[in-house]
Amino acid sequence: MKRITLLFFAMLLTTASFAQGIFNLFGKSDDFFKNLNEKNYTAAQTFFDPTVQSKVTPAELQKLWENITAKLGPFEAADVLQSKTEGDFFSVVMDAKFAAGSQPFLLAYNKAEKLVGFFLQPKSNAASYLNPAYADTTLYSEKEVYVTALKHKLVARLTTPKGATNFPIVVLVHGSGPSDMDGTVGPNKPLKDLAAGLAAKGIASIRYVKRTMVNANEFTGAFTVKEETTDDAVAAVALAATIPGADKKQIYLLGHSLGGMLAPRIAAMAPQLKGIILAEAPARKFTDLLIEQNKYLYEASKDTTKAGKVQLDAILKELENGRITTLGTMKPDSVILGLPASYWVDLNNYNPLETAKKLNQRILIIQGENDFQVSMNDFNLWNTELSNRSNVTLKVYSDINHLLSSQVEKGTASQYRMASSVSETLINDIVAWIKGT
């Protein structure tokens, strides 16, 4: 029980083991595979450090690639499986998908961001990312951009529909905890799915690496959701207004989980937003949410032992410490449930329902009944407080879980280890709402 609680709800304690540079390497790895696929073997060789280029000739790269495609068929795409630092080197494991199967590759980079190794990896039994059927790459393009807020420069991905002008654009905001730009949880990448699904229907998006992922060292003292989320979200909205071809009057923001909870606050800070989308967004105090989640996970575990109940009671008692609304004599950087007291005070004094009531922008609230992290109790609060407002639309999906994928049951954390895609029905509904159809 304790391990599950920390995994899901300590939110910001996880320290990033790599810096901003590792995300630049994702783009380089993509480009490397594109060159191989386009038979630009000489260009592919330039990705390697000069000290190893003589050992990795264009002819050898051609032979390797032709052997692989002869066995697995034409190349389709490559997705990041994992990345880490090893001393002065960075490694990126990519899962390359071909028409007849997949093959993991390890790309080793030095500090100069040059390849010093390119290896075939053994296939893992773990699930890998599932490219959704609606992700038709002939309909959209992607490129690297940067979200800049004060001194921070975060790697981002701009996804735009091909051949379109005056298109709407959506800023995608993560949930709690350190997160990459895809919102990766196990083999699932909900923000990447959303970007692909929206772009295939003519709507652009910006998604970016969360600051707590790449600048974890800045989050050791006192901070709030301002530093964690809202500053960068507002900066991403400003960036959206500069994108060529984007309709500056059709800028939206989609917040997932904590991002959805904070979406009304962000909208108040960014009046240029046409509307906001709250996906699986808490409406209650986080302490109430965490208590409900832990009770659910305890019941789902079917633990009937006395020790299990004692442990649950201890966790619930500990969670009560997160209800503080003032610091009093407490220092802002005092740690409560793995987060500074300043964080809890700020979040507990924020009322997303009342903030949303003051907005004139359009609001879409979506909730899945198979979500065990943010439940229908939250949606019912949104519905009670906002359903009578003309600028608000609310939708419930009987099958969708917290990662916005269709599931046959509510499930537990183990569900997140299985590859699934964001519901196409949900994406189509978002598209229809944005386009006003």
What are these regions (language model features)?
Residues 26-27, 42-87:
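Short solvent-exposed beta->alpha transition segments
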Residues 125-165:
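N-terminal cap/lid segment of alpha/beta-hydrolase-fold proteins
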Residues 166-175:
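Short beta-strand element of the alpha/beta-hydrolase
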Residues 239-297:
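Primarily recognizes the serine-hydrolase "nucleophile elbow" in alpha/beta-hydrolase
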Residues 277-358:
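Accessory cap/linker subdomain of secreted extracellular hydrolases
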